[in-house]
Amino acid sequence: MPGFWWLSGLIVGFIGSLIAAFGLTINLLISWFATPISALPASALGVFLVLASLYSMSHALGSSVVFKQALAGATMWTLGLISAIGVLVVSGVLWDMLYIMFHVKGGLYMIVEAYPSLIAAIFIPNAVAGLIGSIMWFKSLRELAELSQEYGFMMAGMSGLVGALLVLTGATLLLTSQAGIPIYIFGVAVQAVTWALLAGAYIQALVNELF
């Protein structure tokens, strides 16, 4: 019988997955009319957390092997998507910055003026998403299940944070298009802190597992 903290983690993880799914929906609806490419890695990360939570629950409840294999395949496919899109978007942002710096008059001033918020909103989330996806791509799903048992409560909380972050990302993108940078700065600052906490928690869990 699983311990109290693992069961609590599964329950909170299920709730966090619902939050992540809600955030994913809002994010996609908003980004459909704004910047869909930059939103994809965050959305894919939300999908991954939902799949990971479902796999953990199926592992606890003893679901069929076919169901587990289907979830395993979907989860690994999503991890690959996170890594690929994250790297592509980060590369695109860097390319845009270099192009503006060297080919646009006053380009350096434009970058200093506008790009800090852009980096916080797009570069950091996609870099972190790509990093997490790349690291976990090389971890088997069995090890992921063991991680979810040992760090179930923490991972559940992280899924809730990602769900909230997805809503925040979409909201700040919308606010930027309507009200400009001043309102946007607060949102991207919160995003940067949240992503840093998310990356730190997962990397710590992986390091503890490996060493």
Describe each PLM feature range.
Residues 109-121:
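Short aromatic-rich membrane-water interface segments that cap or initiate transmembrane helices
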Residues 177-181:
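Membrane-interface helix caps and helix-loop-helix hairpins in membrane proteins
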Residues 1-95, 100, 108, 125-171, ...:
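Membrane-interface extramembranous regions at the lipid-water interface
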